[in-house]
Amino acid sequence: MKVTLIAILTCAAVLVLHTTAAEELEESQLMEVGMPDTELAAVDEERLFECSVSCEIEKEGNKGCKKKKCKGGWKCKFNMCVKV
């Protein structure tokens, strides 16, 4: 009888700890929702700059500005990175 009671209490304690940890993880993920927008904007500006600089370098070397593919679904167009 004591073994069964100890097993039930142990399972209950593990369940409570697991549930609490899962709730804390969910709350921390919800708090970070706004962060990716600012990081994404910085990446967009960086790609725009890299693409326009690479086009300018090609123009100065007496070559036409080719439509280079930027990384991550972006394309170089009119000296700007444009989302494809």
From Swiss-Prot:
Propeptide, chain numbering: 23-47
A Pfam family the protein falls into: Toxin_20
Described purpose of this protein according to its UniProt entry: Postsynaptic neurotoxin.
Organism listed in the record: Cyriopagopus hainanus
Signal peptide start and end residues: 1-22
Cellular compartments annotated: Secreted
Protein name, entry field: U4-theraphotoxin-Hhn1b
Molecular function, one GO term: toxin activity
Keywords: Disulfide bond, Neurotoxin, Postsynaptic neurotoxin, Secreted, Signal, Toxin
InterPro entries according to UniProt: Hwtx-2-like
Annotated disulfide bonds: C51-C65, C55-C76, C70-C81
Family: Belongs to the neurotoxin 12 (Hwtx-2) family. 02 (Hwtx-2) subfamily.
Tissue: Expressed by the venom gland.
Lineage, uppermost ranks: Eukaryota, Metazoa, Ecdysozoa, Arthropoda, Chelicerata
Listed SUPFAM superfamilies: omega toxin-like (SSF57059)
UniProt xrefs under PROSITE patterns: HWTX_2 (PS60022)
A single Gene Ontology CC term: host cell postsynaptic membrane
